Amino acid sequence: MSLHSKKEQIQTLREQGFVVVPGLVSPERCDELKRIAQRQLQEAAAPIEFEADLQYPGAPSSKDAPGGHTVRRLLDAYGRHPAFAQWATAPEIRGWMELYFGEEPRLSRAHHNCMMTKHPAYGSLTGWHRDVRYWSFERDDLMSVWLAVGPETVDNGALWFVPQSHGAAFTSDRFDEAKFFRTDLAENDAAIRTAVSPELKTGDVVFFHCNTLHSAGKNLSDQVKFSLVFTYHGASNVPLPGTRSAAKPEIAF
């Protein structure tokens, strides 16, 4: 990526709340990341989160139900394997984040920091939400980086985004008790109808703001979908003491 194109990408992100950077990671590197994830998935290597733990729509009702041991996320990706950590702190990520935040970036180990796995049949639907709902920092200015380890389409549960929603001042009554954006309100429905789902090829990366409304559908294909996801913030935007956001040491580049 040239500096000029980075600036254009960041401008798009500031305006829309997300931006797709095509082909940022080589297919060969993605294949390596996928092989590691498949092996760890097969081993059920801890720490992991099961679909049954969250009870999102379409998830098994319990770990004893059919599909009850379907994995949703391989947690603490940074600590799971050096290949994951190398991508999380890659020079191209540092350069992008420095340009966006205007200061040294930090990698949060408390949020995302996972290999997302979306399985056929038991992979759940994720409702509309802002990631910042459970995050506690001095400022609501964090950036998530979503690497498509394989192709992502509507058919296999790709992300949907509501453009420009990161700047919208939604009142609390627009969200339910779990802080999902309510789908039973006409005013919310009007926003949701503007949503787009960018089709991602292997190695494409989505940068999106923590206030951008997004969701993801079910995986209707016959293959597990893998996405490596990390979250970053500027060094001056510190997690609030005593909160989940401060529960794990952060990574300086």
PLM features per residue range, with description:
Residues 24, 112-113, 164, 210-212:
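Short, well-ordered beta-to-alpha junction loops that form the rim of enzyme active sites
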Residues 81-86, 190-196, 216-217:
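Active-site rim elements
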Residues 43, 47-51, 62-65, 158-161, ...:
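Non-heme Fe(II)/2-oxoglutarate
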Residues 95-98, 122-197, 237-245:
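Catalytic core of non-heme Fe(II) oxygenases with the double-stranded beta-helix
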Residues 113, 145-147, 228-232:
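A structural signal for short, well-ordered beta-strand segments
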